Amino acid sequence: MDVGNINHLFFIGALLVAASILMSSLSNRLGVPILVIFLAVGMLAGVDGVGGIVFEDYRLAFVISNLALAVILLDGGMRTRTATFRVALKPAFSLATLGVAITSGLTGLAAAWLFDLPLLQGLLIGAIVGSTDAAVVFNLLNGKGLNERVGSTLEIESGSNDPMAMFLTVALIEMLLAGQSTFGWDFLLSLLQQFGIGTVLGLLGGWLLLQLINRLSVADGLYPLLAVAGGLMIFALSGAIGGSGILAIYVCGLLLGNRPIRNRHGILHMFDGLAWLSQIGMFLVLGLLLTPSELLPIAIPALLLSLWMILFARPLAVFVSLLPFRSFHLRERLFISWIGLRGAVPVILAVFPLMAGLENAQLFFNVAFFIVLVSLLLQGSTLAWAAKKAKVEVPPSPMPVSRTGLQVHTTSQWEMFVYRLSASKWCVGAALRELKMPPGTRIAALFRGKELLHPSGSTRLQVDDILCVIGHDEDLPALGKLFSQAPTRGQDLRFFGDFILEGDARLSDIAALYGLKLGEVDGNQTIGAFMAEQVSGNPVVGDQVEWNGLTWTVAAMETGEVRKVGLKFPEGDKPGPQLMF
């Protein structure tokens, strides 16, 4: 390749990335996921689009997509809090294993019938599209305000279910190549090997990488690069010795993100950019790889297969997988059933049969791509609507304008949070000494206009003041309440109810105040303990219980315990003024 061709390649690549970024603003206007925009740019630049670029290198696409997926999972793992495992780990694992198997099997049976294929080839299509996609789920759920049980379950499931789909895909390809028609014990052993090696190597490699980052003294900009390089080494090593590289790098990210690590914010900041670049690059390449005209002949059976998977296979898999977990309400199960988002992973897996030279491999690829398009357009674009209908949304916690890590020592967890005070903030007009700051936090600076003030305890806050507060991540909820808008009936109260009660209020006192009947309920029990008992011991903000004809909603959690409960009366039956216990 001469210099001129290299320059053309660089220019076209940069142009496609820039076009994807510029067109991403259309996502909100059109009501479609931003990843669909990236995919559309690739398709427009491809062989059937205005660009006319002919790209048929499946191996290169496979390499690029795997690299991008690894980076996305490493970033997603670092941002997943292990505290959510309290309510989400077991159900997510059930969905990632049993759920994928059921979805793949039912989808495969339908594929064999719709496309008149041998059973094993139909099951191969089911395996290819059997898992949800981490890149899509992390992207679409970010900032949507889902309750912890639902949001964390979907995120952990998407980060851990790819090994099952990949294992089923590879196993079925090997069976088709060998002419086998039955599963043996080695099938189960191989599955255990994939999960076992991936998990162990992710934990061990993540721990070693953490120690290296915390002990090594280099330029700040090199720590994120070291984290990425280490994660990719773990990803590659796990795959080379028979484990799941996808699971290994996700577990590695989990460990790095939940332990004190040097230059945490620098790493996360760079990871954010790398994850976006990976998503753009991956969906651009997959868009270039697709020939839209080849989808038309299979459109009707592929659409029927998509609807079968979305409306029957996925819901049945979810309901069966979540049977042991009583804490999931029906509406939460229905929402999880609907948000079975497919993305790049099915397309990556669909490249396997092409590289293996299987019969009907191009059909498998086109069907997988069609299902991904339907999933992104149908499920992705209706996520917010479905969350509202299923009542799994909770009011988002107020967040600072910006936050920056303070590298006080090697594994410092100190941060600086910046808040701008608008007229609706209830702390406006208060003196600094009157603010009930969380223990261990300090106001480091106060800006008024362009001036840095030297405040005292008597300094009163004004509209448009900018406060710089030093604290820890766990202080954000309290700081958010302190520097947030004053609560109104149109905001938190509309969701949580008419009154907000303290979690340690006794049921007997509440019953006496509101004229409720305790029945067989222990009056000495606190309302917080009562709520936890009613939702099978793992409550999350947004959980609702009907008792005495009233709606009780978990309004705040702390260290796994219910701290505040919202009480909502039926319309037209609200006694007295609002009370705060």
Curated annotation (Swiss-Prot):
One of its GO terms (molecular function) is flavin adenine dinucleotide binding. The chain crosses the membrane at residues 3-23, 34-54, 58-78, 87-107, 109-129, 165-185, 187-207, 231-251, 280-300, 303-323, 334-354, 367-387. Keywords: Antiport, Cell inner membrane, Cell membrane, Ion transport, Membrane, Potassium, Potassium transport, Transmembrane, Transmembrane helix, Transport. K(+)/H(+) antiporter that extrudes potassium in exchange for external protons and maintains the internal concentration of potassium under toxic levels. Its main location: membrane. Residues 403-485 form the RCK C-terminal domain. Belongs to the monovalent cation:proton antiporter 1 (CPA1) transporter (TC 2.A.36) family. NhaP2 subfamily. This is K(+)/H(+) antiporter NhaP2.
